């Protein structure tokens, strides 16, 4: 959090943190006091950590909302964002079945254009399966949680 904001909309914002791989910069998020900024920063950080670890997007504004339990011990979680069109889940299920991978839990939430599916599976098989999910024409982004 920076105590001073750019002078106007569209004004350049420069910081040495901008190019670092382990830093996420957020826009102004509404704190008018240092205490409020600290509380908001902690809240945003916790939400980002929950998304990174578990795939939870419970309070998202412009993304399908999913509030997930922690992945059960021994299972692995795949997070897959794709265009909301017919047949995507069928393609994903076919790839997993051909690899002999069992789906233990599946969570799907969609909005008009975007779907977010979370799969808890018993294993990943080889890298070819993940590459296959990533290369699907409808895939926007795919990753393994954790």
Q: Where are the regions that the model predicts?
A:
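Rossmann-like dinucleotide-binding domain for NAD(H)/NADP(H)
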Residues: 1-70, 116, 146
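A conserved regulatory-domain signal marking ACT and ACT-like small-molecule sensing domains
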Residues: 58-146
């Amino acid at each position: 959090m920076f105590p001073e904001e750019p002078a106007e909309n569209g004004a350049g914002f420069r910081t040495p943190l901008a190019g670092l791989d382990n830093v996420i910069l957020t826009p102004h998020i509404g704190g008018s006091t240092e205490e409020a900024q600290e509380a908001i920063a902690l809240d945003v950080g916790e939400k980002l950590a929950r998304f990174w670890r578990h795939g939870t997007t419970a309070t998202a504004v412009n993304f399908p909302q999913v509030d997930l339990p922690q992945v059960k011990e021994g299972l692995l979680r795949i997070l897959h964002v794709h265009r909301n069109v017919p047949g995507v889940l069928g393609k994903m299920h076919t790839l997993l079945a051909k690899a002999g991978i069992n789906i233990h839990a599946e969570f799907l939430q969609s909005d008009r254009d975007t779907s977010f599916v979370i799969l808890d599976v018993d294993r990943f098989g080889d890298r070819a399966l993940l590459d296959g999910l990533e290369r699907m024409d409808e895939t926007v982004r795919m990753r393994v949680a954790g």
